[in-house]
């Protein structure tokens, strides 16, 4: 299962809630980002290369062992390179005949700015602890498309349409409520 959405929408937190009541394992975006930041500056070529390769290898091993993953990531659905990376991460599962699904979370900006400061987020994501920068990043990403929309074509449309997809506004839902809805949908 791939959970998409803007920063601070609750992807990791909802993913944790899904894993707490199912046999899924969580592989959230910052499982890769935080260790690599210790060695390479964010966004540099070696950082980007290793980030992509590590995600891909985790997906390959999970698919080979039948491990059900919740993978969370923020990316731009209108940028072909982002979509190509996403396709490469789900490919090991689809090639093995294993189920792939997408969940697209959305929440109002004011909700995401509040969630940006939660203890669980800051504990798991040291790069978000500079709150002035992190809040600005959440606001910046508000201008980008992080989920598909049937009324606005994007580079991700074909990929997402190839698998079951749930779009869920979790502005007023707890992580547990969102997880319950997602698991019921599955």
Give, region by region, the residue ranges found by the protein language model:
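Short, amphipathic alpha-helical "lid/cap" segments that border enzyme active or binding sites
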Residues: 55, 59, 175-183
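Switch/connector loops and helix/strand junctions flanking conserved nucleotide-binding motifs
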Residues: 109-116
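Conserved substrate/cofactor phosphate-moiety recognition/catalytic segment
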Residues: 13-63
